[in-house]
């Protein structure tokens, strides 16, 4: 597989272009669901901490800020669904901002709050951030490389006994995420292309039957005459 095939998920590029608005709309709908879930979860967690006496401002305040950001992104996504002219670029912007929000939470709670421990949470974030939405491989690769650059710079700046392990685990998580995200979106485009071809075949068959049904009465009348 060459680079062109990789970036187009193995399909001809011109066949994927009509599906960009469909992809953008699906991503915005997904973002509204994620935004609702995160807004609730990021508020419930600090409340539970307060109820059980584990309130710590450095742990709870970022979650409340993230809940507000998730709510804002959800409302913005809902408004964009009603604006088809700017659907594709705004969908890319909003999904990128949501992915950045999740990554920043992973960086804060793993690298900043626990700088000398193995980055389990951040590795999980590096994996799932590529699976949140359907995007082109080039976009996913940019997201992965940006995240890895942040991790490497941080590990080089802060003394950490698990430096090499953390970098290696984040790198492996990014590779797995890229692989899974590519096949996930590849299968999605495959289903869309299959549905389009089936619809075209049914329309062609319907038009053929209509033409035959119009031709048959004239043929019979000509034979009788």
Q: Where do the model's predicted regions map?
A:
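Non-catalytic regulatory/interaction regions at protein termini and inter-domain linkers
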Residues: 1-25
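Hydrophobic transmembrane alpha-helices and their membrane-interface boundaries in multi-pass
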Residues: 38-128, 146-152
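Alpha-helical transmembrane segments and their helix-entry boundary regions
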Residues: 132, 136-142
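N-terminal membrane topogenic signal
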Residues: 23-37
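Juxtamembrane or sensor-core-proximal signal-transducing alpha helices
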Residues: 171-200
């Amino acid at each position: 597989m060459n680079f062109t095939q990789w970036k187009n998920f193995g399909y001809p590029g011109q066949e994927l272009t009509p599906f960009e608005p469909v992809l953008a709309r699906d991503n915005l709908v997904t973002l509204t669901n994620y935004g609702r879930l995160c807004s609730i979860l990021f508020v419930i967690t600090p409340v539970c901490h307060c109820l059980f006496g584990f309130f710590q401002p450095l742990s709870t305040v970022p979650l409340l800020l993230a809940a507000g950001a998730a709510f804002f992104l959800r409302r913005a996504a809902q408004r964009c669904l009603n604006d088809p002219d700017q659907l594709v670029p705004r969908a890319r912007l909003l999904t990128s901002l949501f992915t950045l929000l999740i990554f920043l939470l992973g960086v804060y709670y793993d690298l900043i709050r626990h700088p000398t421990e193995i980055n389990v949470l951040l590795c999980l974030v590096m994996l799932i951030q590529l699976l949140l939405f359907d995007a082109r491989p080039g976009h996913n690769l940019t997201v992965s490389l940006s995240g890895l650059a942040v991790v490497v710079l941080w590990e080089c700046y802060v003394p950490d006994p698990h430096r090499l392990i953390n970098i290696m685990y984040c790198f492996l998580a990014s590779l797995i995420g890229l692989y899974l995200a590519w096949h996930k979106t590849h299968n999605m485009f495959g289903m869309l292309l299959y549905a389009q071809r089936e619809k075209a075949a049914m329309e062609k068959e319907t038009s053929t039957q209509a033409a035959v049904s119009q031709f048959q009465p004239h043929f019979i009348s000509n034979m009788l005459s």
